[in-house]
């Protein structure tokens, strides 16, 4: 089982998480960088690390060691056998985690870092050494054109079909996504540096996992746990940022109804694994502005039952209602029918787990999957009875805009 190092402190007055990442990734191991920006300020903690073993979700849970990685949306079919899996698409791994041989936790409030895993003196020496250059080794060609799947017409037709299912009583909401694929010359590191500038978010992550990379700026917690306390943050309701955005959201019957529906779904998910009477709302219907959109945000909290593990909590809430719909199982069945391709990492979870201490999982949205020189993007919109097909398509494009801007910026640097 995992036993954390005795507290080993490293001064960070001349060291950033990105600088630490550049040093730790040099030996070719799988590596990760997790940061957070909330309301324009750097979050309290950042995590940087690397490991030589890359495993799937079941192996990550069983190993009893610190792990960082992703669990794809399509894992839902294992949890709910009634949900069919559509065509495979690109054949991406359903899950991929690195077991951390080296793990450093930055505490930006105290201006220090702790070596949680790894030989402390060796890690400290490595972090104190010269910083490798993040620049690419040689000039490369720029990326290619963006291919969108489905087309606008096909997506809007799927929205019409989803509304028919809703009118027939099959579901209250169905989250339909659209994809974009774009060849790119930018590296995962270059994409991350650009994305954290373009779209700073509560969950910033760079995962380089044995030939596959995820670069993301997710605004939304899937679920997190510290000890026996659990929480999740439903986000639903979207408008363009700027003057009057909060009033537009709070005054929109559609956005409020969509949000309330998903808050109720989140409360139900937590109630499956929390002590009776402990699930409550800590925040409710609060407008929050991000770089390219403004959302309504709530927070649901609860206390876990004594026999529930952090991974049990993750399964109980997976996938998030904000990327599936309500009721969740029927919505996922309809997503498989209407989208026709597996989602891969999109709509799943990116997470770290410290056994016996904490788990923090965000929803894998606002995420670039870099696979063999192709950037894969995806975004969705919650379809309800009064949805406008063209408006839902445009909402997806707004959500993709930050990712596409980050790619262009990274390619300009390359």
What are these regions (language model features)?
Residues 1-414:
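Extended alpha-helical targeting/anchoring segments
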